[in-house]
């Protein structure tokens, strides 16, 4: 319980002011219906569909329900016909007791939109109970000296029916001394009084027996009887007389058992036994008498049972004081029960919707009614929910409330809400009731799948096996159920020339990517595409991510020697003057490698030589140089084998064979002579050949210059279509050579006289210029560089 002085925070609180509600609804008259009690179950009461102006189908569509006080199911609404029928046989006396009229309050609830229609069912009384006296016989002691017209109160009969069906009249069997007078109390109840018509004489007749009959006003009337035994006494001049004819007292309903309610007091002027007074409850129903106990000696009335204001708010007791001589007096005690705040507020749920979709603002979650059985301030209530939930309360009529969502919910943020509805009355001390409602939030497909990365980079080494798993993409969906089930797909590539469908595939369930065929770094070094992730919601949502596939180079290409030409014909002969200094550049071996990175780093070394130590090869650039001074003792013809090796793992290599001819000077070169020719013939032939060669070289030199200019201009337009071999990235190691064409032969064009040692005709062969920077990416194009 909360203290009386507690201030309520300004939260979602709705103050239920009953008086204000009554004023608001004062002009809203409820619909009234009536039915007789004891009507059989299933009987027709009214056609609600017609009364409300609704079609029969609308009642079912709007979820029509009948809600009565205390959730009693006395009425039932047939949604198919719109008829209101009895769900059970009604007993007016059980429902309302002596209260008249007997009205059952109920409401008709309609949804979409919410509408509460108040209605009342009047249960009319039928005459199904006969009057009953509390005792079978009433004994009266009347002094023989009683004067004519003396009135003697009689115990009244009890009839559970009300109105005209209750007791309307009393009569007595014919006799010569008494008649019965029927009186009406302020509350409308009738009671009998016996009136003395003629004097009594004890000596003549000591006792009389009469029959008192109570008759109700029903049709047909019912009656009940009791025997009256009149004992004629000797004279007792004074009857007991109460100090007050009416005692009015107020008792709080929480008074403890045994507490004093009131003390009545009467006096008798007689003496002896005629003056001894005893008190008794004259007549009241068992329901009225049950909470009280009257002391016959002291007149004290005490509680023997706790009172309940909500069950019965007042009691009327009739007290009789009798003396020893048979005379008696009567008074009334009116006990008004004062209400205290002893009832906690009550809440009853009429409808509850759970789960609710997450994207549905202003959705009705629950419809409930509150009440407090106390009265006044004790019955006023405050209804609220906690602040940290996106819900609010909307008051309706007849203490009904709607719990609705305050805005759109987000299941991904919170999927379940525990809402505590707190009802606090304004009594002292304040009492409160809390009711917990669990609301589940159902998922709506409002979240698209999200990839764990906006882009993925995958590395695949070339020459892979088909169906190789090269990587995975992953996306998650914050929704649940089928809305969170993600399927993956390949999106059409932006490059229309990329054959994506033949390169990779994706597992639609888990996002695994597979290479469909073996990749070739030299043909395709990298490609990119987009993958999509789509959920199974309705409508489906999707997202995409970029995937880059980088093909890693493998050392699958051997070095290719561009110069000297290795085409299976006799190797060209390099001419070296014998006067050449050490370090003289004889020629340069030019080679390329189709791989990239360190797989394309080339190194050169002299593998074989006719005379070791005479020539050397620079490992960096493939230049063949003289290692020392030449002498006359050195043979004229030398054969060199140069090894070109890359830096791959395992390394690949190629060889180049060089023929070197030592001559005394370019004007009189030494030529290898055929072994079978005579010396004179060789000398004559050599002279002729040299003359022809010099003339030819001069002419061809001019022609070659012109041809070179034309070829350069022509090949510039074709340079874009000619592939280039990859060159290594980063710092180039000291012992490797870059084959990008920056060597000594890259900017020069050599025209050399090649002599075939085995030819008797000693023909000259002319080599066209070599362009080492323009290379081919396949074996077919490699041959095009040497015409």
Curated annotation (Swiss-Prot):
It is a single-pass type I membrane protein. GO terms for biological process: cell adhesion; homophilic cell adhesion via plasma membrane adhesion molecules; nervous system development. Residues 712-787 are cytoplasmic. It holds the Pfam family Cadherin. Keywords: Calcium, Cell adhesion, Cell membrane, Glycoprotein, Membrane, Repeat, Signal, Transmembrane, Transmembrane helix. Glycans are attached at residues 418, 436, 567. It comes from the Eukaryota. GO terms for cellular component: photoreceptor connecting cilium; plasma membrane. The chain crosses the membrane at residues 691-711. InterPro entries: Cadherin-like_dom, Cadherin-like_sf, Cadherin_C, Cadherin_CS, Cadherin_N, Protocadherin/Cadherin-CA. GO terms for molecular function: calcium ion binding. The keyword Cell membrane applies. Residues 1-26 form the signal peptide. PANTHER family: CADHERIN-87A, PROTOCADHERIN BETA-15. This is Protocadherin beta-15. It comes from Pan troglodytes (Chimpanzee). The gene is PCDHB15.
